[in-house]
């Protein structure tokens, strides 16, 4: 994309670039910024059973530095940040973009996209639990007597975090960037102060150590890779949050602060362990003097809360995209800011995440145990993104097949190796993220498939709208009574007479002066300009067909959109307008095309969906619902 194509990046002043880059430090890099708390410690464990050698320590740090370089810097910062959907990034944004050009393998792309989104939602459960636990565990070094209170303290912090979501975080969000920036600077300073413990650690910049270690260690080398991958967890946030900050601020923050700070800290941890092998039990916190431990624990806890907040917000945003793209049932979405429509709260998602996070903390109890389960969801999401990126460069950038293979195949192979290394931890809790991701994938696939079958079933009994209008406007003794005002009938199929219109005629025997057949569509792009918001077609003197178009990142506020429609010439008084909605009772059918259990599950999801009148922000006192029954 060009610089000007992104809303944040047109004519960007240095001060605006600085503040956006600072903001991205808190939101985009919060997750990856908490990895030093546990990544090196976990990577040491598989090879420390028979003592550590100098070569092993240097090789581990080398693996971490080159993982950050190849996966984060090359794949995400330099490449994927350019693969945007009109400024927006993330798995579902990429899927929406690819659906425009998919040829013959739409179902495969869709399943991949849903799996990527599901893995991200699983990550949104594990990240808060792991990061807060790992930060609070620093209290053991401050006061060993607090060891028994680590889990209760973590639960309280996480509970408060989820409770405040409904109030919005706009008031404190401005501090996220500066606090996280201080966190990175403190980590960098600690790393610098310990590199002098053994300057030999600087040999880790040589990739020879990383490659040689993997070749010589065999099985243990593969196991270690699973822990090494913890250094890049959070990289998906760079792409997912592209729309919030823009490409340049995210890149500047990475190269000027985040990447140097992470590298220096890992080098410092490595040098510390080389000089004092006994510090391998917790090299991150043992880098700091006793007097600094408590302040660092407090700062680490703040950083992990910010990282957790970022991933929770990302989950809310992804769910809204999923709803608008038709992958999830409608849910109640509350806006927590009057000025920023991106700040939302989804109560049902918040509740599910809260239950999941607390369950993980109480089940695993330590960051050591939880870290084993962490990598699978992240590596899985990265593999999915890489495969979809391959399709993107072929379809959107017109890369030849050989060029796409040469550029992306090494990344996919590397990430598959990381995924394989993490799959070795299935029996140690690695099954948890797989179960979570499977559950979310089943939900999204069931909803998508069920709504498609529902649409197909209703189409068989539909009456073409032009034929209906022609018949109803013929004057006869059986013509319905005409009443003043406007009736708006919501329908997903603008070519057919809406069920609500037919039921209204059948039961009430009336027809309004003006009848609007309204269809709401979601575009395969994040936002739609007001001049492109609607399309009006006059079918007859009394019937109009209107299509409202929203971006998948927008609130589908029909009342506001209709105000724009009035300015365009469709005259009606909102206070004398009635909205007619069809309410379908779905009954399972063994011959629906889905297994019976999936039929039942779809009905459960449909019954739990929020009302269309609430989701589309219709005036409550102007809505009429007419029921019908359909077998699916």
UniProtKB/Swiss-Prot annotation:
Topology class, membrane: Multi-pass membrane protein
GO cellular component: plasma membrane
Record field: catalytic activity: K(+)(in) + H(+)(in) = K(+)(out) + H(+)(out)
Location of the protein in the cell: Cell inner membrane
InterPro entries: K+_transporter, K_trans_C, K_trans_N, Kup
Transmembrane regions: 17-37, 60-80, 106-126, 144-164, 175-195, 210-230, 254-274, 292-312, 344-364, 370-390, 401-421, 426-446
Keywords tagged on the record: Cell inner membrane, Cell membrane, Ion transport, Membrane, Plasmid, Potassium, Potassium transport, Symport, Transmembrane, Transmembrane helix, Transport
One of the record's GO molecular function terms: symporter activity
A family per Pfam: K_trans
Top-level taxon of the source organism: Bacteria
Primary site of residence: membrane
Stated family: Belongs to the HAK/KUP transporter (TC 2.A.72) family.
Function text: Transport of potassium into the cell. Likely operates as a K(+):H(+) symporter.
Entry protein name: Probable potassium transport system protein Kup 3
Organism, scientific name: Rhizobium etli (strain ATCC 51251 / DSM 11541 / JCM 21823 / NBRC 15573 / CFN 42)
Name of the gene: kup3
């Amino acid at each position: 994309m060009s610089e000007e194509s992104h809303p944040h990046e047109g004519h960007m002043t240095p001060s605006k670039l600085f503040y956006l880059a600072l903001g991205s430090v808190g939101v985009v890099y919060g997750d990856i910024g908490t990895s030093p708390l546990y990544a090196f410690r976990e990577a040491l464990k598989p090879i420390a059973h028979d003592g550590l050698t100098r070569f092993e320590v240097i090789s581990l740090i080398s693996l971490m530095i080159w993982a950050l370089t190849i996966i984060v810097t090359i794949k995400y910062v330099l490449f994927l940040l350019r693969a945007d959907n009109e400024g927006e990034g993330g798995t579902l944004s990429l899927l929406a973009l690819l659906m425009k050009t998919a040829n013959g393998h739409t179902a495969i792309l869709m399943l991949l996209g849903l799996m990527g989104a599901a893995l991200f939602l699983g990550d949104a459960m594990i990240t808060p639990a792991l990061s807060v636990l790992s930060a609070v565990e620093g209290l053991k070094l401050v006061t060993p007597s607090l060891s028994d209170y680590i889990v209760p303290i973590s639960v309280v912090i996480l509970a408060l975090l989820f409770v405040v979501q409904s109030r919005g975080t706009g008031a404190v969000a401005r501090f996220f960037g500066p606090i996280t920036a201080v966190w990175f600077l403190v980590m960098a300073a600690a790393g610098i102060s310990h590199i002098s413990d053994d300057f030999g650690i600087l040999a880790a910049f040589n990739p020879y150590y990383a490659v040689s270690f993997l070749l010589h260690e065999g099985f243990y080398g593969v196991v270690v890779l699973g822990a090494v991958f913890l250094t890049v967890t959070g990289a998906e946030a760079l792409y997912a949050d592209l729309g919030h900050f823009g490409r340049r601020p995210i890149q500047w923050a990475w190269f000027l602060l985040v990447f140097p700070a992470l590298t220096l800290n890992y080098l410092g941890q490595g040098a510390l362990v080389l000089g004092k092998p006994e510090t391998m039990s917790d090299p991150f916190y043992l880098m700091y003097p006793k007097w600094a431990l408590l302040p660092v624990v407090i700062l680490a806890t703040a950083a992990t809360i910010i990282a957790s907040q970022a991933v929770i917000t990302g989950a809310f945003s992804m769910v809204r995209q999923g709803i608008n793209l038709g992958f999830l049932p409608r849910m109640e979405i509350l806006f927590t800011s009057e000025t920023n429509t991106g700040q939302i709260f989804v109560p049902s998602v918040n509740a599910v995440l809260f239950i999941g996070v607390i369950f993980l903390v109480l089940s695993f109890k330590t960051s050591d145990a939880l870290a084993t389960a962490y990598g699978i969801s992240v590596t899985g999401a990265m593999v999915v993104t890489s495969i979809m990126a391959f399709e993107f460069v072929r379809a959107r950038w017109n890369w030849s097949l050989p060029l796409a293979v040469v550029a992306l195949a090494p990344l996919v192979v590397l990430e598959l190796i990381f995924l394989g290394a993490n799959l070795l931890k299935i029996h140690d809790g690695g099954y948890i993220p797989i179960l979570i991701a499977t559950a979310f994938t089943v939900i999204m696939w069931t909803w998508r498939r069920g709504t498609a079958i529902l649409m197909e079933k209703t189409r068989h009994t539909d009456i073409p709208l032009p034929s209906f209008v022609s018949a109803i406007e013929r004057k006869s003794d059986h013509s319905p009574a005409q009443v003043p005002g406007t009736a708006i009938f919501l329908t997903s199929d603008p070519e057919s007479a809406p069920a609500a219109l037919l039921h209204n005629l059948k039961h009430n025997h009336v027809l309004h002066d003006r009848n609007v057949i309204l269809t709401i569509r979601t575009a395969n792009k994040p936002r739609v300009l007001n001049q492109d918001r609607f399309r009006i077609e006059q079918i007859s003197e009394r019937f109009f067909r209107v299509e409202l178009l929203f971006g998948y990142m927008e609130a589908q506020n029909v009342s506001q959109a209709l105000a724009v429609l009035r300015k365009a010439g469709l005259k009606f008084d909102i206070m004398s307008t009635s909205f007619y909605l069809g309410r379908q009772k779905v009954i399972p059918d063994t011959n629906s095309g889905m297994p019976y259990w999936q039929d039942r599950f779809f009905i459960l999801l449909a019954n739990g969906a929020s009302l269309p009148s609430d989701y589309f922000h219709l005036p409550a006192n102007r809505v009429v619902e007419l029921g019908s029954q359909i077998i699916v």
